[in-house]
């Protein structure tokens, strides 16, 4: 038997789940070939739910992430068909949980599409990225909403929130890094805050421009406590313009202040708080107490990520402007354009159908009129013949 025939028989045995036949064929040198769609024996075993056959093939060294001609892996097959046990054994053997097919859909997308809740939970457990978007800009959560599956939607929503909380680099989370240079533009020119603050001690320093900076030490409380402490500490700074500028250091106690480095800068008629701590997230910031603040405070993030203004008599709430990623915005625009084009085409098609119906109706009216004229002529002939017959009888 040729190698080609052995390869074909191996595919058939894997499809049928014949473990012994698979072992015999591999022992006889059957190659791991694919069919015309690029489907390997492992694809077939995973697709048709043959757990033991899948294990035999994996132990024999069949590629766990083999791709078909549409880039589907065995994990895609098993997840799409809802074979949770096969999904798990593939993942345990190191299958790529976030592999994408030609539609940029992962196993999680396919499991959600076919409402396989057990498989969805298993994929999330093994680290599937719930934020991944398909070619149609759909996450697994979007698909569950489209399918009306509330249970899956809830599971995926919780998973999305958990991944955001454990991933500080999530696009919806504001994170500030200490490596970003800090500059304040004041009446005296541009001031580099990095040079104003010592790297070790909590201190207050002043430069020649009259801009003062306060740096606080480390702690483990929330950013809200940080800004509250900074607000209280800023009260004496509001009168800094009335006192002579000195180059001495003044230690400030801030045990409740969070983060590695916090800076308060007073310049002109306002105070600027710049948070330069590495890894601080402002997701839990709601309001800042304003007692003791005599002038506005501006909290500035690096690169202009966020600006929070606290008037002296108001309580400011965090405002986070979250823009869609450029790729998603482009996808949304493409979808909107497609919808608009589809509506225009539909209107044009309806108008064509209406025009065609009007033409048909006009044609039928003309035919009816012609028939009526023929009927009238025939009736007149009958009347003439009747009169003629009557006259003959009278004679």
Curated annotation (Swiss-Prot):
Keywords: Acetylation, ANK repeat, Nucleus, Repeat, Transcription, Transcription regulation. Changing residue 295 to A: No effect on transcriptional activation. Minor reduction in activity. The modification N6-acetyllysine is found at residues 69, 352, 381. It is found in: Nucleus. Its main location: nucleus. Residues 258-327 are annotated as: Transcription activation and HCFC1 interaction. It comes from the Eukaryota. Acetylated by EP300/p300. Deacetylated by SIRT7, promoting heterotetramerization and activity. One of its GO terms (cellular component) is cytoplasmic ribonucleoprotein granule. SMART domains: ANK. One of its GO terms (molecular function) is transcription cis-regulatory region binding. Transcription factor capable of interacting with purine rich repeats (GA repeats). Acts as a master regulator of nuclear-encoded mitochondrial genes. Heterotetramer of two alpha and two beta subunits. Interacts with HCFC1, causing repression of transcriptional activity. This is GA-binding protein subunit beta-1. The gene is GABPB1.
